[in-house]
Amino acid sequence: MQDRIEEVSVRKVVASEFVSLDGVFGSPDQWHFQYVNDEMEETRKEIFATADAMLLGRTTYEEWAGFWPLQGDQGPAGYMNNTAKYVVSKTLAGPLEWNNSTLIDGDVAEAIAKLKQQPGKDISILGSGALVRSLLRDGLLDELRLMVHPIVVGGGKRLFEDGGDQKPLELVDSKTLGTGVLYLTYRPAGG
């Protein structure tokens, strides 16, 4: 009889972001929706289906906690409202009011390591640019998925600001949507 070694799967931390050709990810409500179609909706559903928890930064949490609870529980609102949310902030005070929200105000690396060891699907990050940059810099981001929209916004909040450290990435998947949006999946190089 052969001994079976069960492989323990560790959850990944995966950031999924909308960005313009010039790197803007802020205020997607002003430039993203013209590219939404059934194909993009299917891609969004796939992203949601692979994760059962979210990491959010303070700014994204505050914006979304004032919006999503008022949208009901159908479609994206159901996912946002019912999914476990872990909010990284040194300035927010708990307990957090939005359903299924937990504050991470201590050692972020330790908290994420514990989350990754828990059973479940991946842990997603949507928005939360400062958190994405911090986790990528510190080696805590396992995957970066970018939906690069074929538009030059001309100004706005960039996903990667000037002055950051270089971080080599490896392209592991790419898909071109019918609207010209590129769906690119990267992992830290050598990881």
Predicted regions and their residues:
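Non-cysteine beta-strand/loop elements that form the S-adenosyl-L-methionine
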Residues: 147
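Portal/gating segments that form or line small-molecule/metal binding sites
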Residues: 8-140, 150-191
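Short, Lys/Arg-enriched N-terminal segments with co-localized hydrophobic residues
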Residues: 1-9
